[in-house]
Amino acid sequence: MSDVIKTDVLIIGAGPCGLFAAFELGLLDMKAHFVDILDKVGGQCAELYPEKPIYDIPGIPHVSGQGLTDALMEQIKPFHPTFHLGEMVETVEKIGDPAFRCTTDAGKVFECKVLVIAAGGGSFQPKRPPVPGIEAYEGTSVHYAVRKMETFRDKNVLIVGGGDSALDWTLNLHPVAKRITLLHRRDEFRAAPHSVEQMRALVAAGKMDLRLGQVTSLAGTDGKLTGATIKGNDNNVTEIACDAMLPFFGLTMKLGPVANWGIALENNLVPVETSAFETNISGIFAIGDINTYPGKIKLILCGFHEGALMSQKAHRYVYPEKRLVFQYTTSSSSLQKKLGVS
């Protein structure tokens, strides 16, 4: 077992609602750690519509999904939250009243007094490519997210996909890997034009390979990949050496392991009471799109409201002997000091 990471609050989901919750918690002296299955913060905003304008954030006439994420990250800087990205909380065990032990699929173990589920519609799950036997290599040679770039040092890496993730990791891993092969169904990419230009320049210089087609089979033993068979768009079949494969076929939304934690569910959503958005288990809260209650509206601004009320109740669990005196950031010198503006 890895060393236990102890924190006041563990937040599952680093989208806008989770990020703002960390701000509210920080004002009340509660330390937060985040776990998110995505390899970057921002949730749906950053993953699905980073450049799409949002028009219903109070006081901000319009902002992009990435712009909102960047602003929230700047806002929570004074509280130094810790992020564990590319991971998913698999198990939650109650060890106190309240206290919880949470374990991720990467083997990290957290102990917290408060657990906040801010996972949007659930966890983003990578789409598995239709390659026979690929399951045997998952987690050892086939990866759906990059957790450590060093994992791919001096390896022949096959990256499959044509979106931003595929292009970004092609460029980022190029200096690390022995050889990068990018495979896509067609010679058109749904990625930032500058990234596509950089990739094509590397191909032209002979520093990486670009192939058009799809993977039809994998070769290897004991979960260790040694090669892949590719059927090209011209129907020619070739074999390439590869030690690692990174398929980026997009994401699908699933409730995920939440269903196994003993939390009450209602149509794949988490019902909560509306004074603090607590679930049926004391100390576990749900905010944002994943929760449900009478009159629920799935707006980011509603999730901000939920995070503010949640933090007030969370304070009772983290500091049971401490009386909470409500303060305003406009007039409280102690809050301004925490924010570094006094």
From Swiss-Prot:
Task: Enumerate the residues binding FAD.
Answer: 17, 36, 44, 49, 89, 124, 289, 330
Enzyme Commission number(s) of this protein: 1.18.1.2
Tell me the Pfam families matching this sequence.
Pyr_redox_2
NADP listed as a keyword: yes
Description of how the protein assembles with itself and partners: Homodimer.
HAMAP family, alphabetized: FENR2
Give the family per the record. Answer: Belongs to the ferredoxin--NADP reductase type 2 family.
Quote the protein name from its UniProt record.
Ferredoxin--NADP reductase
Q: Which organism is it from?
A: Bradyrhizobium diazoefficiens (strain JCM 10833 / BCRC 13528 / IAM 13628 / NBRC 14792 / USDA 110)
Q: What is the lineage of its organism?
A: Bacteria, Pseudomonadati, Pseudomonadota, Alphaproteobacteria, Hyphomicrobiales
